[in-house]
Design a protein with these regions (language model features):
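Cleft-lining beta-strand/loop regions that shape enzyme active-site pockets
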Residues: 40, 47-168, 177, 295-422
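Charged, glycine-interspersed solvent-exposed loop segments at helix/strand-loop junctions
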Residues: 168, 172-270, 420-500, 504-506, ...
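C-terminal long alpha-helix characteristic of the crotonase
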Residues: 227-228, 259-301, 413, 469-475, ...
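Intrinsic disorder and flexible/low-complexity segments
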Residues: 299-302, 306-342, 460, 531-587
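Active-site proximal loops enriched in glycine and acidic residues that flank catalytic Cys/His/Asp
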Residues: 306-309, 351-353, 381-383, 403-405, ...
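Short glycine/threonine-rich loop-to-helix capping motif typified by GTGT followed
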Residues: 358-363, 496-499, 541-543
Length: 587
């Protein structure tokens, strides 16, 4: 028996030693993964910056090495900031011979694609090459790749050039079938975010608005491609009418959309010849961006504060939440810290948002007013800065937007669901109430809103709209009547907004930074991005579970993911919304 216990004890001790060793080695490996991003990669002579036009493009991406290691990172995300930095560095780095663009399935708004394209156009002034290849080109990726010196497509490849369409989904009859009715309150002829819940088609006003801005975006895209590919705009429109995605690859050569057909091995051989190297040395945007030294500056910093996603008053969590969010209270605190940071001489707000909570938007507007009393505040609009996104922008000293930016949408709406048809008529649930005051049970889902409540709700929405108009009028030196005439929830492109004086200049983030520095009267400045990245511990555990679950929920729900996400987000936010009237992803 004594021998038996000795053997058991030996096994237990052995297991503890092995577990401790495994635990220690695991932490060493995690430490190595987390610290790997802090070291600069070695770049060899004749290297090529490879930019994959694939995945989801975000303003900033903080890579989670644990998620990637466990295979839970879902759809690949790329940071626009890294792409722009790497292109700028590649132009002056002697070890970079040129840029290689490889096309895939690329999800990005047109304004962000336009900014990448402009950066590549500037890069060409260095005299270095840009080569593009694709097994296939979707329209957004082709728009960027068309700037290349040489454009190749696989002999069996596909190029999709079809124009722009907006195809909103309407849920009214679906909700009626399950017994839910959305009670809507809004201000603005064009504030059509509620239309999917109360109609089965677009209103005439909404249709006219959407037609206006997609025409403007398409005009810019065609002019850019026309200049690069030496194809007339009329010819590009004719090609867009002819189902180019279904034609033979040789037709792309004949119509000058591409230069030639080639297999990937032939393109690699071309790159080896151009770089005069036997083995291709490719570097990614993230690797080259590690060489960015723009944070160094003798006379202080220009802070670039990134705000992307739905505007919310409190964090909305869950596997069908809206992803990246602009959390109002956090932004207010962050801007207060930047206000009191003496090393920060000016702030650029980089905004990519279709809006959200009207209350949170108002609080962030106030934070911007306090900030600009101490230092210049310049807004750089990315793909969207509409509704609540414009609300937080309008009080800045100066606003810069891309020609294809979607902005404006100055309007307010509110929605209250009436689920009595579902709960009572279909499920047999009945409700009774005992209350002390008339408004005690306002908003209960077991009944609809009565006439008095509806009138109060409409007044509430109208007060929110009137406040929005005053904020824009004060910020843009206009009267409220002038603002109202171009507001009403209408969405404008950056080009249109410039003519309406809703913005000050068409340009890039780089232009906004230069304007902020000019206003702060600093020449030698550093550029620092905010909010600061999460610490390693937070980064280690953040999003691993949610990424894993979200990826699978998206797969199960398919096209129904977006509408469910929208309703879920509204449920967890404020009743009053300053939000874009539609999903801006144009196809």
């Amino acid at each position: 028996m004594k021998t038996f216990f000795k053997q058991v004890l030996a096994v237990v001790v052995g297991m503890l030693i092995v577990s401790a060793f495994t635990f220690l080695m695991g932490f060493i490996m995690l430490g190595a993964m987390l610290s790997a991003g802090d070291s600069k990669p070695v770049i060899k002579n004749g290297s090529v910056l490879r930019i994959d036009l694939s995945g989801n493009l975000q303003e900033r991406v903080q890579e989670n090495p644990v998620s990637a290691f466990l295979g839970m990172s879902g759809t690949e995300e790329q940071g626009l900031d890294n792409i722009l930095k790497s292109i700028k560095i590649a132009a002056t780095n002697d070890k970079i011979s040129g840029i290689y663009l490889e096309s895939g399935i690329f999800s990005a708004d047109m304004a962000s694609l336009e900014e990448i394209r402009k950066a590549l156009t500037d890069f060409k002034k260095s005299g270095k090459f840009i080569i593009a290849y694709g097994d296939s080109y979707l329209q957004g990726a082709y728009y960027v790749a068309s700037v290349a010196d040489s454009l190749y497509i696989n002999p069996s490849g596909m190029l999709d050039w079809h124009g722009i369409a907006s195809q909103p989904m309407f849920y009214k009859e679906l909700l009626e079938k399950v017994g839910v009715k959305m009670q809507v309150f809004r201000v603005g002829t064009f504030k059509s975010a509620v239309e999917p819940f109360i109609r089965t088609d677009m209103s005439d006003a909404n249709r006219a608005m959407v037609q206006s801005f997609i025409n403007d975006i398409w005009t810019v895209a065609c002019k850019d491609v026309s200049a690069s590919r030496k194809i007339s705009v009329d010819s590009l429109n004719a090609l867009a009418d002819n189902y180019m995605a279904l034609t033979d690859a040789n037709d792309y050569v004949r119509t000058r959309l591409v230069d030639r057909t080639a297999y990937i091995d032939e393109v690699r051989e071309t790159l080896r010849r151009l770089t005069k190297t036997e083995h291709l040395n490719m570097v990614s945007p993230a690797e080259l961006a590690a060489y960015d030294e723009s944070a160094n500056g003798a006379n202080g910093q220009i802070a670039v504060y990134y705000a992307q996603g739905d505007i919310v008053g409190s964090e909305v969590e869950g596997v069908i939440s809206s992803g990246q969010q602009i959390l109002g209270p956090k932004v207010v605190d962050d801007l207060d810290r930047l206000c009191n940071d003496e090393n920060v001489k000016a702030v650029v707000l980089r905004i990519n948002s279709g809006g959200g909570s009207a209350y949170a938007s108002e609080q962030m507007w106030r934070a911007v007013q306090l900030l600009k009393k101490k230092k210049p505040v310049v807004v750089s609009m990315s793909g969207m800065a509409a509704s609540g996104g414009y609300y937080m922008s309008c009080g800045a000293d100066y606003i810069v937007a891309e020609p294809m930016t979607l902005t404006g949408s100055i309007g307010i709406f509110g929605m209250v669901p009436d689920a009595s048809g579902l709960l009572t008529e279909k499920l047999g649930l009945h409700f009774d109430v005992v209350k002390t005051n008339e408004a005690s049970d306002f908003g209960a889902m077991g009944r609809g809103i009565n006439a008095g409540e509806a009138a109060a709700m409409q007044r509430y929405v109208e007060r929110g709209y009137a406040l929005f108009l005053r904020r824009v009028a004060d910020g843009r030196n206009m009267t409220t009547a002038q603002v109202d005439s171009i507001a009403q929830g209408r969405v404008w492109t950056g080009r249109q907004a410039l003519n309406l004086k809703l913005i000050d200049k068409l340009g890039t983030l780089e232009d906004a930074i230069r304007e902020a520095a000019r206003r702060a009267k600093v020449a030698d400045y550093g550029i620092v991005a905010y909010p600061a990245p999460a610490d390693w511990y937070t980064q280690l555990f953040s999003d691993v579970k949610d990424d894993y679950m979200e990826n699978r929920v998206k797969g199960m729900l398919g096209v129904y993911y977006k509408p469910l996400q929208f309703v879920y987000t509204l449920q967890g936010t404020d009743c009053l919304q300053a939000r874009m009237p539609f999903d801006p992803n144009l196809r």
